[in-house]
Amino acid sequence: MGGQVSASNSFSRLHCRNANEDWMSALCPRLWDVPLHHLSIPGSHDTMTYCLNKKSPISHEESRLLQLLNKALPCITRPVVLKWSVTQALDVTEQLDAGVRYLDLRIAHMLEGSEKNLHFVHMVYTTALVEDTLTEISEWLERHPREVVILACRNFEGLSEDLHEYLVACIKNIFGDMLCPRGEVPTLRQLWSRGQQVIVSYEDESSLRRHHELWPGVPYWWGNRVKTEALIRYLETMKSCGRPGGLFVAGINLTENLQYVLAHPSESLEKMTLPNLPRLSAWVREQCPGPGSRCTNIIAGDFIGADGFVSDVIALNQKLLWC
């Protein structure tokens, strides 16, 4: 495959690397018996976009207009698409080292691709293959036996039933006994006692029926907002409606629209996001995990490592000790 595109290094890639590498095992023992859906867990939105392929076709799920523009004016369309598609700069191992424990994996099969090669996708496809990435995650977990990850497998563009079966077989072969089968949301102590480290949510109903190792899709509160205050209002509205019963994600990721892109031709998603991180981080620090109807659980963001987001989310668990 061709070269990859990544976010610029306009922020320190070392901001929170390694400091939170083993944060779950370092939690106060009182929190080891709290179910995962009542803990505060940092996540990354569109985890794999650090390795988008400059030469890949536009995703077939994108609009017909974008497909036509890419064919007619590729030298203009492609750079614009790429700079608004990248949401992460750290690779998956660096994200795990930084403390991220929810990975948002948008999986696809390119029509032009090899029969069994699955990629990740966000408007364009990644250089990374799914099987290689899952292996990388498994190897990281072997080095961190008391850390737990939630892998949200979704999108599934171009996947036939046979490819779903192939993907699930890869998941089982790679993670083996690390997989926590579907059931009540476990605590860290329960997972540790069973040697389990991986919860796989899988947004395909037929696959769920066939494989008890897979969990239903984790709800994601996606605000689809350009402005920070509008996104925060959306999240507060969702909280007022009551949290879901199990694992769920509050996404603090801003989202561009066509009007914004046309009005800001020199910008990118990174340039739009970074100046707004202080306000988003302030909102994060106000949250509280737990069973209450307005409590948060997983909080996912863009450009992990750009600020203290991961540490802020982890620190919310201290509020559970005040109850």
UniProtKB/Swiss-Prot annotation:
Acetylation found in the keyword field: no
Record InterPro entries: PI-PLC_domain, PLC-like_Pdiesterase_TIM-brl, PLCXD1/2/3, PLipase_C_PInositol-sp_X_dom
UniProtKB keywords: Cytoplasm
GO cellular component terms, A-Z: cytoplasm
GO terms assigned for molecular function: phosphoric diester hydrolase activity
Tissue: Widely expressed.
Subcellular location: Cytoplasm
PI-PLC X-box domain: residues covered: 30-206
Main location: cytoplasm
A Gene Ontology biological process term: lipid metabolic process
Additional free-text comment from the UniProt record: The gene coding for this protein is located in the pseudoautosomal region 1 (PAR1) of X and Y chromosomes.
Official protein name in the record: PI-PLC X domain-containing protein 1
Gene name per UniProt: PLCXD1
